[in-house]
């Protein structure tokens, strides 16, 4: 009974509003609430054997890019707080009998309220929306209170855990909270509170705490809920208060949101939750990454590979074997890839292998948590399905944003009797991946091209598809290398010439871009758009004679287009 939370209570009674309700006080004034930061290059490609599934996957990718991708990632601050009359229940924390909405736990609490009340409250979503709108409006002009007293040096620090056996949840939600103690000279004990049976706890939880926070040696404890404190230090992820915050605090974020969010209530509408979780990075996560990279400085990790495929230690994980894994690795091995099981490496080795990695390949799983430690040079390649594209792709986006690596997904088929049928995710969970020979070929062509070893391809369509993939992930140089490998084919194909021009444009090489555009025009003189692009590129290269030639061709072959272009761009008349 002590561990039970009554989710039938009204939101105004159930949830703590830090701007209004007693129980939570900031230990320090936050330097910021949120701020924009560079986003990672995140891409997805369809790699199913079935056209029907590929179309579905492409639709999901398009939807994610157009309706849920912000123009910048958002860093949300995490701050130390003092909680009064704190109760750790399940994977949540209460202060003075109200649930604290903090970080991922806060998101789960909102979901839990919806599930618990969907049969009894016809308007459960509207009720939540009204609650948050009232909070936000009522909090305008207010501040979350600061702790003003002298803090007892022995006061403990406590962290809520989803569990202590899932690597992803522990690292990204719980362990990172310890970073808010940096610079505080904290002297008390630290408690991770979790709901699972003690025997289910995995060794990595203690191992990572010891490896990354050696200053707390002997003071870190794992204790099952329920647990009560009269007063305790904890972490408050300010993203948890996003929907309760004064509108003036959040409004500026809308300029980074896609139109689909701006036009449906903005970033403070509950409908934006999924997109926010994909685009927001907690400052504690960035601090954990910085601490991890500092921990490996000056150590020798030369025994670790820079190109590797990550498999699973099936004794410890929920086994999801991928059809085609052995064949894929046989091909990867020929190009210097090694087989790695993260669980067999120490915490510092796991950090180092990612920090120094050139390329990691694996299938969907908690191992992608280690993307947090990757370098900006690292290509992290995940093999998933239409299911992961729909339900799980966004889980790892914040880790890519944090590390600035290049996160690439190939969505293949489901390992099921009928891969054309997408099973119910809630009842059947994630179905393992099945890679067809075609998918293996697509992935390998991509991988080896990034390594500068270009395959010989038979059709312009296949060359074009691969070159577009390379360009999309930031591999313009490799895309040019691929097109040069097929230069005889490319010279006769306007689309391939234009692709090469796009690559040179991406690399800011306007003279080479102009050469490629000239080839594109020769390959297909019926495209007026190529001539217009030649004019713009020649202007950038300061080649007036080329501008005059292109204008002449435009006037002769496409007089209406010529007249429209000249009337809209007065500068052209001075060149002509």
Locations of the language-model features?
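Alpha-helical solenoid repeat scaffolds, predominantly canonical TPR units
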Residues: 482, 516, 549-550
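Canonical positions in the second alpha-helix
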Residues: 485-486, 519-520, 553-554
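Eukaryotic alpha-helical solenoid repeat scaffolds
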Residues: 558-576
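Short coil turns that delineate tetratricopeptide repeat
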Residues: 491, 525, 556-562
């Amino acid at each position: 009974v002590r561990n039970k939370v009554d989710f039938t209570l009204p939101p105004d009674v159930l949830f703590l509003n830090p701007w209004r309700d007693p129980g939570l006080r900031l230990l320090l004034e936050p330097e910021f609430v949120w701020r924009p930061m560079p986003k990672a290059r995140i891409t997805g490609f369809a790699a199913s054997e079935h056209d029907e599934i590929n179309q579905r996957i492409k639709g999901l990718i398009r939807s994610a890019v157009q309706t849920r991708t912000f123009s910048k990632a958002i860093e949300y601050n995490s701050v130390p707080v003092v909680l009064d009359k704190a109760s750790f229940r399940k994977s949540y924390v209460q202060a003075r009998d109200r649930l604290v909405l903090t970080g991922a736990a806060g998101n789960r609490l909102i979901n839990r309220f919806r599930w618990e009340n969907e049969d009894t409250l016809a308007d459960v979503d509207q009720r939540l929306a009204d609650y948050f709108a009232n909070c936000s409006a009522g909090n305008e002009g207010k501040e979350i209170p600061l702790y003003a007293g002298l803090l007892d040096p022995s006061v403990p620090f406590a962290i809520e855990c989803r569990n202590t056996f899932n690597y992803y949840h522990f690292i990204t939600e719980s362990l990172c909270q310890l970073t808010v103690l940096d610079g505080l000279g904290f002297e008390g004990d630290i408690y991770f509170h979790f709901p699972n049976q003690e025997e289910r706890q995995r060794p990595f939880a203690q191992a990572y705490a010891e490896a990354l926070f050696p200053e707390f040696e002997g003071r870190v404890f794992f204790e099952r809920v329920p647990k009560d404190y009269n007063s305790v230090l904890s972490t408050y992820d300010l993203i948890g208060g996003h929907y309760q915050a004064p509108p003036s605090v959040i409004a500026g974020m809308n300029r980074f949101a896609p139109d689909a969010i701006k036009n449906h209530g903005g970033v403070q509408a509950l409908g934006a939750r999924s997109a926010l979780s994909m685009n927001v990075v907690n400052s504690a996560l960035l601090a954990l990454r910085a601490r991890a990279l500092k921990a490996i400085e000056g150590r020798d990790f030369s025994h670790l590979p820079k190109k590797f495929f990550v498999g699973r230690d099936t004794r410890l994980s929920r086994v999801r074997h991928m059809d085609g894994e052995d064949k894929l690795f046989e091909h990867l091995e020929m190009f210097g890839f090694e087989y790695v099981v993260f669980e067999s490496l120490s915490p510092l080795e796991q950090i180092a292998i990612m920090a120094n990695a050139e390329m990691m390949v694996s299938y969907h799983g908690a191992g992608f948590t280690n993307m947090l430690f990757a370098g900006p040079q690292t290509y992290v390649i995940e093999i998933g399905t239409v299911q992961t594209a729909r339900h799980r792709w966004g889980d790892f986006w914040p880790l890519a944003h944090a590390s600035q690596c290049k996160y690439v997904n190939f969505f293949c088929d489901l390992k099921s009797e009928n891969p054309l049928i997408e099973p119910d995710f809630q009842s059947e969970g994630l179905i393992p991946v099945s890679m067809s020979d075609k998918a293996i070929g697509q992935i390998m062509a991509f991988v080896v091209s990034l390594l500068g070893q270009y395959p010989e391809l038979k059709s312009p369509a296949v060359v074009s598809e691969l070159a577009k993939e390379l360009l999309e992930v930031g591999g313009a140089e490799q895309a040019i290398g691929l097109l040069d490998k097929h230069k005889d084919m490319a010279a006769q194909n306007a689309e391939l010439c234009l692709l090469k021009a796009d690559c040179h444009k991406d690399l800011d090489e306007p003279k080479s871009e102009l050469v490629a555009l000239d080839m594109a025009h020769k390959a297909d003189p019926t495209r007026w758009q190529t001539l217009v692009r030649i004019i713009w590129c020649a202007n950038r290269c300061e080649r007036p004679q080329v501008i005059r030639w292109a204008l002449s061709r435009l006037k002769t072959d496409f007089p209406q287009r010529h007249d429209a272009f000249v009337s809209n761009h007065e500068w052209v008349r001075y060149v002509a």
